[in-house]
């Protein structure tokens, strides 16, 4: 991959570097927002050890240079090697240690995914109850631990970055202190907190996608989100459709040229005033679909709908609106 250096602004950015399980880097600003490549909008990077540079994996732009590697000096290729060579503890996190311990799952299924018989199910319910009681004392602690476990589970299922989960836990803590959780399910409130945190961190996820991974209904989660928005003193930015592009492109393995074209389409749509009141995920999917057709990638609208977490009808309607309003002549398949 060829690298392109960005023009220097004179003042270096102060970014915190996180590394995921696949070895890719994510950058977090001092204000807690996820940093994105200014060229293509991607949020995943790699580290060039020889040059001390952080490089975008999509377009190859160098977003940070002349960095010191603050990680360990040793290399490990398996989790066993990493555990043997590590000489320090885990990084500090808002997620309390009790929330990261092994718990008995709520699905009441065995290791093969089969439903437990009624006798075994009652036994598991009793064990789950005693495990919760043994770990914490007060109702406040039990509720908070349960929420932390639920957020950790959602993080693993959805692939949400840890900064978003930590922010969601902080939101839940505030809701718990104001007694907003009383009378509402922990699952719905935790999902609403995560939805809010992802938007605050500029890494929005569609609500329908989040609901697929929780026991709470879409109506419950939406109601809890509106409650948090009304009662907590937090500022949630309006979702920018551009923020959805990198994730759609990553799932469909699209080129950097398609990403740039999709971003340009959305920027033109904003200037034309046709993005207000529209679902940002649907707009992003339609823009990427148009950009793909313009670059000869003739995939179906269903592919883009699945990647964005919206319906095929939404992609089709937004596609027609963008093409008509911006006078884009899309090549016919």
Curated annotation (Swiss-Prot):
It holds the Pfam family Zn_Ribbon_TF. Belongs to the TFIIB family. One of its GO terms (molecular function) is TBP-class protein binding. It comes from Pyrobaculum arsenaticum (strain DSM 13514 / JCM 11321 / PZ6). Sequence repeats lie at residues 149-232, 243-324. GO terms for cellular component: transcription preinitiation complex. InterPro entries: Cyclin-like_dom, Cyclin-like_sf, TFIIB, TFIIB_arc, TFIIB_CS, TFIIB_cyclin, Znf_TFIIB. A zinc finger (TFIIB-type) spans 33-64. Keywords: Metal-binding, Repeat, Transcription, Transcription regulation, Zinc, Zinc-finger. Stabilizes TBP binding to an archaeal box-A promoter. Also responsible for recruiting RNA polymerase II to the pre-initiation complex (DNA-TBP-TFIIB). One of its GO terms (biological process) is transcription preinitiation complex assembly. NCBIfam families: PRK00423.1 (NF001658). This is Transcription initiation factor IIB. Zn(2+) binds at residues 37, 40, 56, 59. HAMAP family: TF2B_arch.
